[in-house]
């Protein structure tokens, strides 16, 4: 047995890694702290220990799938009908029903299997990744491929992929509430080692990090010690396996109450009324309703025979019951939803929860972040202001990673506010600033040390890396886009991060590194810095800082950057008028700085402030230094303000068009961003969230459109609810602000979607009706909390998702209408058919049970699938969102169901009676509901005519419901020829076309094939009766067209009398009309914005 195998076996038994040092842990598990595992070894271990999963994400439960197909009300009607058929010895009907049940269950199983596989593959697309070191190089792999011995890197926003023995931590906190129930984050320390004699609980093992915990602060490196079900969370998952949650064991309730609750849960799960997506539950409830209606109709049949129930009456009752069951409905729904989820992948939307497919069509408010969603997320440094030094501008730069691109200029001494308000226009711009700086060709009254201090801070208060990829000869970067923009500028000025710290980049050649260092020795910032501590960016404080030791002058330096308000609150001084001495910051000084922040933000730039402080080794003792490096408040106090940077994040090219289309679709778009209010307002105007002519609106209206997070959070719930409209832009917003916004929308009965990418966005993503996470820049935690993931982080992809959600909802509505209208037609037809009595006084059913089943299962199923694949209607995104409370069962759908059903009933009844009394002699014979005899000739031929008519009407109905109101012959009014328009209508959906053709043709063989026709279907070949079938099918088509014409006239009249409900008129209105017409902005709510 190999050494690795021994260690793996020991690893399964050993649980005291918290008692080992990092070196001991690495030796025990067989890995290198610096190199990690080799690729071959990692593959061998993966094969030995299996994938790192809890075993329940992608496993297909075949038993549950079978039960799901069998245990529903629709199948139960078929099963009962089958049992009765066999009980009365109608072997043919019973056999056909058995076959239908088997086919239905088989098709359902296949489609559910495919749908499950599709959803599992989509889950894999959005599953968390892990960052590991293998062969000495950092790699990103799927979390399921992590094995014991991997060296794993984690940072803020990551979900820890496996149990880790930490070997390096930097201000590292994790959320272990999922494991321990402790709501507060837990601080970790890799240097701790616990005694072997001590009993240390899982929650107290502070040198370990546990699988599925979220990183809420800092970063760390650790050895993977346990994976999958061997991890701490895996042990819990293993103990919970097999608990369905259907049995109530509430100790506060009595045995009888628990039994009642459990019975309801089990029955609901059995019938599908309390499991699955909301739409599945609604349809399961519909199935239960139809079951009881079927029972009622069967009772009516028996009552009409005075409950003298013989074989024929029982079969007729079965026939009527079957007519009420759209048995193919669940199958078609499953196919439609799985296809919809697959289609969304091609449109950069990954569906994680099927519920979201239904919810997307009802969304009427979208709350979106700005950075990387509305904008490209590829940030470019545009302006830098260093007090007493001047303003640096960067132009002609479009590549966010290439430091060699662009022109750098200096406006000496002028601040952005000053040069933008300079009436002379001559601000003395100095071109080629970099060359002038290093050639010392700058005005004598400009102190280069000011720029050096700012540049050192910008470089070191930064963890992004910029490098030239030797393989592709292209510039690339790793890190946050904002930090990348700053690091690119530092690299442009020949002062990259590794030039100050001496760190070697694994992505650059040594030649490049040496070049940077050798060039840097004679330029600003030549000191060598050692990283001591880091306080990472936090959405609460909105800043980050790093502590470095300068080996050249033996000083400790704290460098910070962040939002202006956050940084300025930490500063007590800045460089005075001479630019040399540090002087206290006064309120007047802060207001001067604030003016420049406004000036930059009003140009759509994201503004960050920079500050620093330093002290010598003699100024602090060890305890004071430890306090500084561990206490954020101490480290980030009494800083010296150094300057500002304005970063431009250009809007995506598709954003403005997407916002316009959302407005056309009746969807409001809100921007909730952490950026400064001026930046947010400028970008919002650029993309159309705010009107471009905002200056035409009164200040009161502007204040209702734009707020800051503190202003919105400062309002009570009552004050928020009293606002006539909710703000379109909230700047400087926190995660809690997003939660309050969603709560406010929900109180207004709005159906909203929320985008998010950070750990702290999880509450708002969960609370929103549709949570949307970012696939590229989103954290693992936000993805897990979301319903859908945008694989390209693009706002326009949300439009794709909404459009696909509406298309799918539309199509579900169409095939539900088609199937239920057929059921109504068949049920009414058979109930009316009770009036036909044979020579023995028994009812003669005008359609046989097998004919009913054929129309429901064979004729209707494939056209219904075709309707599920129907393309989006041309006006799909010109309609308002559908009512989420009503769902697909609107009053229009309900009325249409009965209208089409009644028209179809009339056509079929006319065909039956026309054949029976017109073409034939009108004799109803005797015993014609079971076997054929000579007296049944007229009845059997008339059934054939009615069967053909019902079949063809059902197929024509599928074409008619492609559009709920528009005439089938005017589906494409933009076509230049009626003939072309007709063929475009029938050929546009080829699956539907061939399904209908198949249905039309299938009527002939079942009428003419011997034995099948008279023994199974209980009808006979016909001749002249085909004319009746064709005539009354056309009559149905005309009736359907007249009904739709009446609908169009009705809605036109409604629009004329209620122009405010006219959708076309609404689309032409100003989307900001609700704001401009608001007349009551409460004066007690101070929402003014100072600028």
Curated annotation (Swiss-Prot):
Annotated region described as Disordered, given as residue ranges: 499-525
Matching SUPFAM superfamilies: Calcium ATPase, transduction domain A (SSF81653), Calcium ATPase, transmembrane domain M (SSF81665), HAD-like (SSF56784), Metal cation-transporting ATPase, ATP-binding domain N (SSF81660)
Cytoplasmic side: 1-63, 112-282, 334-815, 870-885, 965-991, 1043-1091
Annotated TM spans: 64-84, 91-111, 283-303, 313-333, 816-836, 849-869, 886-906, 944-964, 992-1012, 1022-1042
Residues at which ATP binds: 371, 483, 561, 606, 673-675, 732, 738, 760
One family name in Pfam for this protein: E1-E2_ATPase
Cofactor(s) listed in the protein's UniProt record: Mg(2+)
InterPro entries reported for this sequence: ATPase_P-typ_cation-transptr_C, ATPase_P-typ_cation-transptr_N, ATPase_P-typ_cyto_dom_N, ATPase_P-typ_P_site, ATPase_P-typ_TM_dom_sf, ATPase_P-typ_transduc_dom_A_sf, HAD-like_sf, HAD_sf
EC number from the UniProt entry: 7.2.2.3
Keyword entries, A-Z: ATP-binding, Cell membrane, Ion transport, Magnesium, Membrane, Metal-binding, Nucleotide-binding, Potassium, Potassium transport, Sodium, Sodium transport, Translocase, Transmembrane, Transmembrane helix, Transport
Topology of this chain in the membrane: Multi-pass membrane protein
Extracellular side: 85-90, 304-312, 837-848, 907-943, 1013-1021
Biased composition (Polar residues): 503-519
Domain of life, per lineage: Eukaryota
An example molecular function term from Gene Ontology annotations: P-type sodium transporter activity
Keyword Membrane attached: yes
Keyword Nucleotide-binding: yes
GO annotation (BP), single: intracellular calcium ion homeostasis
Family to which this protein belongs: Belongs to the cation transport ATPase (P-type) (TC 3.A.3) family. Type IID subfamily.
Misc note: Present with 639 molecules/cell in log phase SD medium.
Function (record text): Catalyzes the hydrolysis of ATP coupled with the export of sodium and potassium from the cell. May export potassium less efficiently. May transport other cations such as lithium. Sodium/potassium efflux ATPases are involved in salt tolerance and maintaining the membrane potential across the plasma membrane in high salinity (Na+) or alkaline (K+) environments.
Name this polypeptide is given: Sodium/potassium exporting P-type ATPase 2
């Amino acid at each position: 047995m190999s050494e690795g195998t021994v260690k793996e076996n020991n690893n399964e038994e050993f649980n005291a890694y918290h008692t080992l040092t990092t070196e001991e842990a690495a030796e025990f598990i067989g890995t290198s702290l610096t190199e990690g595992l080799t690729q071959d070894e990692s593959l061998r271990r993966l094969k030995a220990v299996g994938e790192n999963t809890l075993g329940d994400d992608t496993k297909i439960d075949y038993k549950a799938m079978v039960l799901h197909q069998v245990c529903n009300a629709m199948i139960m009607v078929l099963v009962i009908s089958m049992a009765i058929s066999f009980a009365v010895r109608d072997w043919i009907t019973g056999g056909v029903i058995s076959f239908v049940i088997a086919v239905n269950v088989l098709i359902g199983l296949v489609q559910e299997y495919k749908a499950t596989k599709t959803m599992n593959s989509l889950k894999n697309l959005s599953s968390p990744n892990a960052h590991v070191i293998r062969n000495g190089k950092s790699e990103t792999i799927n979390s399921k491929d992590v094995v014991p011995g991997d060296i794993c890197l984690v940072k803020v926003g990551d979900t820890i992929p496996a149990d880790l023995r930490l070997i390096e931590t930097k201000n590292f906190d994790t959320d272990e509430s999922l494991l321990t129930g402790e709501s507060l984050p837990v601080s970790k320390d890799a240097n701790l080692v616990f005694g072997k004699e001590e009993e240390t609980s899982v929650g107290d093992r502070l040198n370990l990090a546990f699988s599925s915990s979220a990183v809420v602060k800092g970063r760390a490196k650790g050895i993977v010690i346990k994976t999958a079900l061997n991890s701490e969370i895996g042990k819990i998952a293993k103990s919970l396996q097999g608990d369905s949650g259907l049995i109530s064991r509430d100790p506060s309730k009595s045995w009888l109450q628990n039994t009642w609750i459990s019975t309801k849960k089990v029955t609901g799960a059995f019938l599908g009324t309390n499991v699955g997506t909301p739409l599945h539950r609604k349809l399961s409830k519909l199935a239960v309703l139809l079951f009881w209606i079927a029972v009622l109709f069967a009772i009516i049949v028996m009552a009409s025979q005075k409950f003298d129930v013989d074989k024929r009456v029982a079969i007729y009752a079965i026939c009527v019951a079957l007519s009420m069951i759209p048995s193919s409905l669940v199958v078609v729904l499953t196919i439609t939803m799985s296809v919809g989820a697959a289609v969304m992948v091609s449109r950069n939307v990954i569906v994680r929860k099927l519920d979201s497919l239904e919810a997307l069509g009802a969304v009427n408010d979208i709350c979106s972040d700005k950075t990387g969603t509305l904008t490209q997320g590829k940030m470019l440094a545009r302006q830098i202001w260093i007090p007493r030094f001047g303003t640096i501008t960067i132009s002609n730069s479009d590549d966010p990673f290439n430091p060699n691109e662009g022109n750098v200029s200096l406006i000496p001494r002028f601040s952005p506010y000053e040069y933008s308000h300079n009436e002379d226009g001559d601000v003395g711009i100095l071109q080629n600033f970099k060359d002038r700086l290093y050639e010392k060709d700058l005005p004598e009254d400009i102190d280069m040390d000011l720029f050096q201090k700012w540049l050192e801070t910008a470089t070191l208060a930064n963890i992004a890396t910029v490098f030239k990829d030797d393989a592709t000869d292209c510039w690339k970067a790793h890190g946050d886009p904002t930090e990348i923009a700053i690091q690119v500028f530092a690299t442009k000025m020949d002062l990259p991060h590794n030039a100050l710290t001496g760190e070697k980049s694994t992505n650059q050649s040594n030649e490049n590194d040496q070049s940077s260092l050798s060039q840097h020795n004679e330029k600003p910032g030549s000191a060598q810095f050692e990283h001591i501590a880091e306080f990472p960016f936090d959405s609460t404080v909105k800043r980050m800082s790093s502590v470095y030791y300068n080996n050249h002058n033996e000083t400790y330096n704290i460098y910070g950057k962040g939002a202006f308000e956050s940084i300025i609150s930490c500063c007590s001084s800045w460089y005075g008028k001479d630019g040399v001495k540090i002087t206290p910051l006064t309120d007047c000084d802060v207001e001067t700085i604030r003016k420049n922040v406004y000036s930059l933000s009003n140009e759509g730039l994201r503004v960050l402030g920079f500050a620093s402080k330093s002290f010598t080794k003699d100024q602090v003792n060890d305890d004071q230094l430890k306090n500084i490096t561990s206490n954020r408040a101490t480290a980030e106090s009494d800083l010296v303000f150094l300057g500002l940077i304005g970063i431009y994040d250009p809007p995506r090219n598709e954003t403005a068009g997407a916002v316009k289309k959302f407005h056309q679709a009746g969807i409001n778009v809100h921007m909730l961003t952490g950026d400064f209010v001026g930046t947010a307002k400028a970008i919002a105007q650029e993309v159309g969230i705010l009107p471009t002519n905002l200056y035409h609106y009164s200040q009161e209206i502007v204040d209702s459109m734009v707020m800051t997070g503190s202003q919105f959070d400062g309002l009570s719930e009552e004050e928020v609810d009293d606002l006539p409209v909710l703000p379109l832009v909230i700047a400087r917003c926190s995660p809690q602000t997003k939660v309050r916004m969603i709560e406010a929308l929900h109180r207004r009965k709005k159906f909203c979607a929320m985008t998010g990418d950070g750990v702290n966005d999880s509450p708002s993503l969960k609370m929103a009706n549709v949570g949307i996470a970012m696939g590229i820049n989103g954290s693992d935690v936000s993805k897990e909390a979301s319903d859908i993931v945008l694989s390209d982080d693009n706002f326009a992809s949300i439009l794709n998702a909404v459009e696909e959600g509406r298309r799918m909802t539309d199509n579900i509505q169409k095939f539900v209408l088609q199937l239920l209208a057929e059921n109504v037609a068949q049920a009414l037809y058979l109930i009316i058919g009770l009036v036909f009595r044979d020579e023995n006084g028994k009812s003669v059913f005008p359609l046989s049970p097998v004919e009913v089943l054929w129309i429901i299962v064979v004729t209707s199923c494939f056209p219904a699938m075709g309707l599920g694949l129907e393309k989006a209607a041309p006006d799909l995104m010109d309609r308002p969102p559908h009512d989420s409370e009503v769902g697909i069962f609107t009053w229009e759908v309900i009325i249409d169901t009965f209208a089409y059903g009644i028209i179809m009933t009339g056509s079929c009844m006319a065909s039956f009676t026309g054949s029976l009394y017109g073409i034939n002699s009108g004799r109803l014979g005797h015993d014609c509901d079971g076997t054929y005899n000579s007296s049944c000739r007229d009845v059997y031929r008339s059934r054939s005519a009615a069967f053909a008519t019902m079949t063809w009407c059902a197929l024509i109905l599928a074409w008619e419901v492609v559009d709920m109101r528009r005439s089938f012959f005017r589906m494409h009014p933009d076509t230049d020829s009626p003939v072309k328009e007709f063929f475009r209508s029938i050929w546009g959906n080829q699956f539907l076309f061939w399904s209908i053709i198949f249905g039309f043709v299938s009527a002939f063989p079942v009428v003419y094939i011997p034995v099948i026709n008279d023994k199974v279907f209980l009808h006979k070949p016909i001749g002249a009766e085909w004319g009746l079938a064709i005539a009354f099918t056309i009559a149905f088509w005309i009736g359907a067209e007249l009904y739709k014409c009446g609908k169009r006239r009705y809605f036109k009249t409604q629009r004329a009398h209620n122009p405010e409900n006219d959708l076309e008129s609404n689309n032409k209105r100003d989307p900001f009309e609700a704001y401009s017409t608001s007349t009551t902005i409460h004066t007690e709510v101070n929402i003014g914005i100072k600028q």
